[in-house]
UniProtKB/Swiss-Prot annotation:
Family: Belongs to the class I-like SAM-binding methyltransferase superfamily. TrmB family.
GO cellular component annotations of the record: tRNA methyltransferase complex
Reactions accelerated catalytically: guanosine(46) in tRNA + S-adenosyl-L-methionine = N(7)-methylguanosine(46) in tRNA + S-adenosyl-L-homocysteine
Catalytic site: D132
Gene behind the chain: trmB
Biological source species: Halorhodospira halophila (strain DSM 244 / SL1) (Ectothiorhodospira halophila (strain DSM 244 / SL1))
Function: Catalyzes the formation of N(7)-methylguanine at position 46 (m7G46) in tRNA.
EC number from the UniProt entry: 2.1.1.33
GO molecular function terms listed in the Swiss-Prot or TrEMBL record: tRNA (guanine(46)-N7)-methyltransferase activity
Pathway linked to the protein: tRNA modification; N(7)-methylguanine-tRNA biosynthesis
Binding site for substrate: K136, D168, T205, K206, F207, E208
Protein name per the record: tRNA (guanine-N(7)-)-methyltransferase
Length: 231
């Protein structure tokens, strides 16, 4: 029996690769890239060459904020997921310049990666900063924050693991809040229906700066997986 078609939560916006980004994708991929297998889970200890707390960053954009976090946090390993090739190339260049050995990058559908290729429980933190808001109501099913995706995260996060979200779309912020508050497995670290007080504990991102220039308000949410309900 064929599997039901997965709803896409992203749009591939290829854009134009600079020569530097193209060279990075070709020359730095063996150092930082993750060739996700068609089947089976990734050996994270083998991938990073050690056992350490792990952070999954979904949709890292140009990667500058991700590299900054990984550089400031050498005791944890960072796995970034992004499908926009120019952003991936830029991230690889930044990672090389920073001399990182605790960052790896994959260019696959993040939902499929979590569902099929990550062992559980293996993640200390999952962070999703400024995902596609899919503002039209008929597209809300494409938003990555859905009850079914929380089911996957609850299986992959370690007990007490964190889910950190950020958006500059007020409607999506309320959607995130409603979805997570309805899930008893997750606890809001700032109190019921509370956003993180500014400034949030993360670097500013390219998409965040763009939203601020448009006059958008940024909302951060941090939830923890209750230890007694971990998958």
């Amino acid at each position: 029996m064929s599997q039901p078609r997965q709803t896409r939560t992203f749009v591939r916006r290829e854009g134009r690769l600079t020569q530097g980004q193209q060279r990075a994708l070709e020359g730095l991929w063996p150092q930082f890239g993750v060739d996700v297998p068609e089947r089976g889970v990734i050996d994270l200890d083998g991938l990073f060459g050690r056992a350490a707390p792990r952070v999954l960053d979904i949709g890292f954009g140009d990667g500058e904020a991700l590299v900054e976090m990984a550089a400031a946090d050498p005791e944890r390993d960072y796995l970034g997921v992004e499908v926009h090739r120019p952003g991936v190339g830029h991230c690889l260049l930044c990672a090389e310049q920073a001399g990182l050995d605790n960052l790896r990058v994959a260019t696959v559908d993040a939902v499929e990666l979590v569902r099929h290729h990550l062992p559980g429980p293996s993640l200390e933190t999952v962070q999703i900063f400024f995902p596609d808001p899919w503002p039209k109501k008929r597209h809300h099913k494409r938003r990555i924050i859905q009850p079914a995706f929380l089911d996957l995260l609850a299986e992959r996060l370690v007990p007490g693991g964190a889910l950190h979200l950020a958006t500059d779309w007020a409607d999506y912020a309320e959607w995130m809040l409603d979805t997570l508050e309805a899930d008893a497995r997750f606890e809001n670290t700032c109190g019921p229906r509370a956003f993180v007080p500014p400034p949030p504990p993360r670097p500013q991102t390219k998409f965040e700066r763009r939203g601020l220039r448009k006059g958008h308000q940024v909302h951060d949410l941090i939830y923890r997986l209750r230890p007694d309900t971990a998958g």
